[in-house]
Amino acid sequence: VQTVTEECVRLLDRVRRELELSEEQFEVVDYKECFCFYHCNQEEKLQNHQAGLFDGSSEKIVYYSLEKEKRTKPCVVTIKEQKLGILTDDKDAGFLAMAQQAFDKQLVSTVYFVGSAFDGGWMQESLKYICRGRRAFLGKNLYSLGACFVAFQKKETEREYVYLGDSEFKMNISLKVRKKQELEFYSLVTAGENWYLKEHSCEVILDGTDTVELWLQHPYGREAKIESLELADLPKRPVRTTRIRITVHLLGDTKADIEIEDLGFGELFPSSEKVWKYTMEF
């Protein structure tokens, strides 16, 4: 879709349920995210500097500027949107002015064109300017191909890059857990996930503590902040006999509700049915 909104996601989610598709088989992405995944899967020589996309799918020309923060791992990708206006009767001269405005003080090495506005072979002087030191590509299926890359690569546990747009969550949330005597991080939420209608949950056994520590890390940084959530009035039980469920409800790109539920430990220690709720804004 052109723009992801909560209303749009709710509507398409109803369609998903009607088609009996699982949440893993379903993803709503906007044009900018499709552009990101399409460009980032092109050959390396096109990745030197910024990439630009002129969208002529509607009456108004829109320009998307893609930039990578290569010092982070994974690489963080952001896209800025600029509305350039309507083409005049002299399309070539009008579009030349738009391109000069879009490229002002920017180092752009790759440019894409999509949409019927660029049909007809009218780009002459504007195209000469755009291709001066830049590679340019014209096509109609960039968004659909980008969506295919999204579907394929979001299944991967380790990614080379993460896209942070308006509808993507901006923080990594993890737990430090012990698994087979080894300490490791369990990812509850990964930065770059679409936050609409999303929740994540897991069950863990407490090891002699009445607090839950969430590790928060911004994708731009290396250091993590630890947020300690106290489980007030948690029933006293022997070590490792308290199982809890942690659920994260995403409320926005920087906001989440955390719900922690006491599950007890089977018939030996029944659940107290206590629930602790926290709201976190980053």
Locations of the language-model features?
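Glycine-rich phosphate-binding/hydrolytic loop that grips phosphoryl groups
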Residues: V29-E43, A136-R178
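Nucleotide/phosphate-binding catalytic cleft detector across ATP-hydrolyzing
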Residues: V1-A51, K180-L250, E259-F282
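A short acidic (Asp/Glu
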Residues: E7-L12, Y38-N41, I61-L66, D119-S126
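Structural alpha-beta junctions
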Residues: R17-V29, K105-V108, E125-L142, A147
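A short acidic Gly-Thr/Ser loop motif
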Residues: K45-V62, E67-K68, G115-F118, L164-K170, ...
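Glycine-rich phosphate-binding loops at beta-strand->alpha-helix junctions
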Residues: V1-E7, Q101-K128, G139
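Phosphate/ATP-binding catalytic cores across multiple sugar-kinase/actin-like superfamilies
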Residues: F35-Q42, D90-L107
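Short glycine-rich, Thr/Ser-proximal phosphate-binding strand/loop in the N-terminal lobe
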Residues: Y63-A93, L268-F282
